[in-house]
Amino acid sequence: MGLGTLSPRMLVWLVASGIVFYGELWVCAGLDYDYTFDGNEEDKTETIDYKDPCKAAVFWGDIALDDEDLNIFQIDRTIDLTQNPFGNLGHTTGGLGDHAMSKKRGALYQLIDRIRRIGFGLEQNNTVKGKVPLQFSGQNEKNRVPRAATSRTERIWPGGVIPYVIGGNFTGSQRAMFKQAMRHWEKHTCVTFIERSDEESYIVFTYRPCGCCSYVGRRGNGPQAISIGKNCDKFGIVVHELGHVIGFWHEHTRPDRDNHVTIIRENIQPGQEYNFLKMEPGEVNSLGERYDFDSIMHYARNTFSRGMFLDTILPSRDDNGIRPAIGQRTRLSKGDIAQARKLYRCPACGETLQESNGNLSSPGFPNGYPSYTHCIWRVSVTPGEKIVLNFTTMDLYKSSLCWYDYIEVRDGYWRKSPLLGRFCGDKLPEVLTSTDSRMWIEFRSSSNWVGKGFAAVYEAICGGEIRKNEGQIQSPNYPDDYRPMKECVWKITVSESYHVGLTFQSFEIERHDNCAYDYLEVRDGTSENSPLIGRFCGYDKPEDIRSTSNTLWMKFVSDGTVNKAGFAANFFKEEDECAKPDRGGCEQRCLNTLGSYQCACEPGYELGPDRRSCEAACGGLLTKLNGTITTPGWPKEYPPNKNCVWQVVAPTQYRISVKFEFFELEGNEVCKYDYVEIWSGLSSESKLHGKFCGAEVPEVITSQFNNMRIEFKSDNTVSKKGFKAHFFSDKDECSKDNGGCQHECVNTMGSYMCQCRNGFVLHDNKHDCKEAECEQKIHSPSGLITSPNWPDKYPSRKECTWEISATPGHRIKLAFSEFEIEQHQECAYDHLEVFDGETEKSPILGRLCGNKIPDPLVATGNKMFVRFVSDASVQRKGFQATHSTECGGRLKAESKPRDLYSHAQFGDNNYPGQVDCEWLLVSERGSRLELSFQTFEVEEEADCGYDYVELFDGLDSTAVGLGRFCGSGPPEEIYSIGDSVLIHFHTDDTINKKGFHIRYKSIRYPDTTHTKK
């Protein structure tokens, strides 16, 4: 039995011909694209109980079945699903690079192979765990025919209309890109995506653990997820996932694929072979479409390859001897478009019009239209705009009620939208205006009468009066750049006794301090004279807006120069539930929010299960000198929707410290969901020490005063183990008379200590400071050096030196923030000297004096020597400089091995993000280079597209490549052919790892092999 049953085009979900196999299935880009999910991040669209493709009763590779599907498709559930190896696959991050999962998938492949053989009747007498084998109706292959009697048309989206919801986790730019992908499908097919209102079945864009995942076709009976996980938010990938939603399978699983491509099985990653199984001819219908190499639903040549340069799918050569390209993720192919139009039975005549203006006409205009013609035009402009349709010619057969030949215009996105008019004859209709941003125009002819036909023009107009309780407003041409010289005015009115709520999904308008050029203006009322709420521009989303009445006035203006992506906003009717007599049913406190409200409790109480009443809670007032604080339910997972506030108070002149023993909260970069906040003071207006989440244990935190506020919040989704923390109070001796210290007093637990400013050392009495010796050796990757006695004038007759060393492979940089040394043309008196090496005999980088801040100085290697000299006469303020490191540079290789590290803080911290470093290793002429990786840990990706180390056998990147590396485990030794090697280290802005350590040397090596065997 084939792994999935369906048609070409990655194979269409063939309900069109009445053939449905397996029901709902999911395709995960953790398998399709090699993208994986972090595991700690969750989509926040949790109020929607959607069908999650990451959870299923049975998994066959990237195919998921639940109990309903097993019944619908007459599959006997004879395997114990609580024990079978399919069960856990849906709860991983995609499985790539996971050795245990690869082994499990290897076993899975064997089981799938057995299922296929059972389906062909080859093991009719075998059983699984003493049960009847897994069977499919029509088990004997020669009896296998399309099951027209069980046609499942509900898997096609009715009318080609797909309602959608975008989860709250996504940024404005991501939302815009999702809409661009949907408009791309709309432009070329008759499929329509609409924002969901009250439709029962719809899709939800989410961020789920299965990476890029989607069901194939319409699931029905409620919402279904389309997961756009980590690294999946690319236009082509979203178009691909929407292809699955519409009804497409992967092209390379067509029954006839062996006539067009060759599967090179020895190059496939172990355990991933099942991704290359094909469907059976009796189980699918290709709808007459040819194999499409260019399909956006086709795997690339190296998908699931053991190496990025090894092919797993090799396309056959065409008539010109050229192998077609496969695996593009740029746009729909002609085959994709043709297949979708067949699947959804799009009329051959008509199109989707998305420009701000355009025209349409009957076929053959003005030379007459054919009989029995059916055309549909869908006009779709930016939400917040209206469509004005003007007929310029009308010459159709006239009949009673326009029964035969007619044009219908509807105010909306499909054939059931409100009718604006039905027209025939030769009388021009009045100008028609839509109430929203979509219009449906349908033309039918059934007579043999010959007339010119019709012609019409349309134009999108922005602004106008909007009288409804909810909707969307976007800048003209959103999500593309808005047009120049536009002025749009919207007057929004909702039901009486309500307010207008306005929230922004994305916002990008030309920036100016006073918003003088392009801007959005919002006023609290019905006109430009109403009170101003705000004039907005720039890239920060405005705060949510709530009018004081049931009206809101908005104006968008663009000038003739810079154009940006614009804005997208939702408006809705809003009421203040807390102003009602029962305060929303809240027992203690009612907090009104835009579009809703929530109950809250006083400190020491928490909301009960009904979310309205209050009960004794976590938190409270703590006056002990020490104690322990834990999250509710410790050591089990903390419950959702908790808000705990601890107020810790100590005696006067004491300070409170908190040390976490264990810490694990739901993680997010901005700690938006579950978090702990620690304040110096008892209110949320005090000094905030930090907001913490994730699994990294915070440092010890000490209050500024004798009280501290600790607040824990959890949302309604993911729960973790929580935290356990100890607090303790200590007397702050420094708070009185500086602890007797001459310079600085530092409080410590149970005691205190004195410190001296730069250039001084602590006296034996541990309180006073005396002038320090002026020789320092510095080994830290960054820090501060100053002239003696800084910030006061430096003393006379002083000589100070600094020997600065950094990590091998990194150059030292010295940058001055202040500089004032006695001026002399040749710096003969007081001066600062900087040397490119470890001693004053090294090449000099500069001899400095005067009042001008010098340019930064960069050494060629990882050592720098700095010397300051003052004479007996004039003294000045001196200098202050920071030393840091820069990666890259030219390094000389010798016969003695040398080291090179990925980053200056190797061993202490992971490498930073957004780095591009190049090292040029050069040996003596006639010698070669040997490179040996001592440590290697770089973010893993199949094509090494995110973080990587790339080597070239020469002076620059045009030389022969020695390899691009990522992942864990050091590569084998590398030998150059020439006397130089260029090393390029690149990192993106997300996952950071330990990095690498290379040991290199110059050798005499006659062999020309690059890699040691």
From Swiss-Prot:
Broad class of where this protein is predominantly found: secreted
CDD domains recorded: CUB, EGF_CA, ZnMc_BMP1_TLD
Alphabetically ordered keywords of this record: Atrial septal defect, Calcium, Developmental protein, Differentiation, Disease variant, Disulfide bond, EGF-like domain, Glycoprotein, Hydrolase, Metal-binding, Metalloprotease, Protease, Repeat, Secreted, Signal, Zinc, Zymogen
Residues making up the propeptide: 31-147
Positions of the Peptidase M12A domain: 148-347
Disulfide bond entries: C190-C346, C210-C232, C212-C213, C349-C375, C402-C424, C462-C488, C515-C537, C578-C590, C586-C599, C601-C614, C618-C644, C671-C693, C734-C745, C741-C754, C756-C769, C774-C800, C827-C849, C887-C917, C944-C966
EC number(s) from the headed UniProt entry: 3.4.24.-
Glycosylated residues in this chain: N169, N359, N390, N626
Secretion signal, residue range per the UniProt entry: 1-30
Keyword Metal-binding: yes
Protein's UniProt name: Tolloid-like protein 1
Species name: Homo sapiens
